[in-house]
């Protein structure tokens, strides 16, 4: 759902894709590495946004950091709110549990 308080620009030069880690990337790490690289190659910003706390196996996501993807641990805060507080507008979400994008469980 588009936030009506911000202008809709379907033609912005660089859109951001927020990708979940658990049950998305973990289901096929090698396949997702290729997909994420393709997104970057065709001009998207790609970030990893996990509902995890930073203390829950943070090293498990190091391979993504080493590939140049920013990783955000929301600590069970709604992902959309969390990244927007950091000044990041995610245009496309890829998540197995879409409620975590809009709802907190903290």
What are these regions (language model features)?
Residues 1-80:
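Alpha-helical substrate-recognition element adjacent to the catalytic core
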Residues 80-99:
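Conserved Lys-Pro-Asp/Glu-containing loop-to-beta segment of HAD-superfamily phosphomonoesterases
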Residues 4, 98-106:
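Asp-based, Mg2+/Mn2+-dependent phosphohydrolase catalytic module
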